[in-house]
């Protein structure tokens, strides 16, 4: 039995040496002496500090020189489509209101339903075309101003809105141009003020402190 045990130990050590596991290793005392100053305990599955795996901000894979925010050209598609859908929905509701008002003296019948449906379709198409045209002009002016100035800020928004109103009302003469420009200037200024309200509020609070 003793001879068998010795032969078994020899075969085990031979296999261990063959697979490279028979070399000298580090004891627990040696590993305990390795300093980990300023580091959290390492994960048993990762050979890195887990603190460096936490990302506070979103990361994007972008080409060299690309921006993380969408430009005027990318937002133009969303703006035009959203305005068309909003105009169609508002026009449909307005057409339904007008249709019910104009046919209130008629009994519920097929002619009345057809007349209401025609009013809904007409008003929906009218408002969708109007808002879509305004969005197209606004987006085109915004892209042109952005490419010309080489910057994207609230000044582009206000300028694009003013020029859109002036061009849309250019058929009404100088008075129509002035009214359209004033309307565009007012709406875009309110929009820019709304977008910067949080930043302005924070700045005022810091100044008051």
From Swiss-Prot:
The chain crosses the membrane at residues 73-93, 125-145, 181-197. It is found in: Mitochondrion inner membrane. GO terms for biological process: protein import into mitochondrial matrix; type 2 mitophagy. GO terms for cellular component: migrasome; mitochondrial inner membrane; mitochondrial intermembrane space; mitochondrion; TIM23 mitochondrial import inner membrane translocase complex. GO terms for molecular function: protein transmembrane transporter activity. It is a multi-pass membrane protein. Its main location: mitochondrion. Disruption phenotype: Mutants are not viable. Heterozygous animals show an aneurological phenotype, premature aging and reduced lifespan. Keywords: Membrane, Mitochondrion, Mitochondrion inner membrane, Protein transport, Translocation, Transmembrane, Transmembrane helix, Transport. Pfam families: Tim17 (PF02466). NCBIfam families: 3a0801s02tim23. Essential component of the TIM23 complex, a complex that mediates the translocation of transit peptide-containing proteins across the mitochondrial inner membrane. Has a role in the activation of stress-induced mitophagy by protecting PINK1 from OMA1-mediated degradation and facilitating its accumulation at the outer mitochondrial membrane in response to depolarization. Belongs to the Tim17/Tim22/Tim23 family. Component of the TIM23 complex at least composed of TIMM23, TIMM17 (TIMM17A or TIMM17B) and TIMM50; within this complex, directly interacts with TIMM50. The complex interacts with the TIMM44 component of the PAM complex and with DNAJC15. Upon mitochondrial depolarization, interacts with PINK1; the interaction is required for PINK1 accumulation at the outer mitochondrial membrane, kinase activation by autophosphorylation and PRKN recruitement to mitochondria. PANTHER family: MITOCHONDRIAL IMPORT INNER MEMBRANE TRANSLOCASE SUBUNIT TIM23, TIM23. This is Mitochondrial import inner membrane translocase subunit Tim23. It comes from Mus musculus (Mouse). The gene is Timm23.
């Amino acid at each position: 039995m003793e001879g068998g045990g010795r032969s078994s130990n020899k075969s085990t050590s031979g296999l261990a040496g063959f697979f490279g596991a028979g070399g000298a290793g580090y004891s627990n005392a040696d590993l305990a002496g390795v300093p980990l100053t300023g580091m959290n305990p390492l994960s048993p599955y990762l050979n890195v500090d887990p603190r460096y795996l936490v990302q506070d901000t979103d990361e994007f894979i972008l080409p060299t020189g690309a921006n993380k925010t969408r430009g005027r050209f990318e937002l133009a598609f969303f703006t035009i489509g959203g305005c068309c859908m909003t105009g169609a929905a508002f026009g449909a509701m307005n057409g339904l209101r007008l249709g019910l008002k104009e046919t209130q003296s008629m009994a519920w019948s097929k002619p009345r339903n057809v007349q209401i449906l025609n009013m809904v379709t007409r008003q929906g198409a009218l408002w969708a075309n109007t808002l879509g045209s305004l969005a197209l002009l606004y987006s085109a002016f915004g892209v042109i101003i952005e490419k010309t100035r080489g910057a994207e800020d609230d000044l582009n928004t206000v300028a694009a809105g003013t020029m859109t109103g002036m061009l849309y009302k250019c058929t009404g003469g100088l008075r129509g141009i002035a009214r359209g420009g004033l309307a565009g200037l007012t709406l875009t200024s309110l929009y820019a003020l709304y977008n910067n309200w949080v930043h302005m509020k924070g700045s005022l609070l810091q100044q008051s402190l």
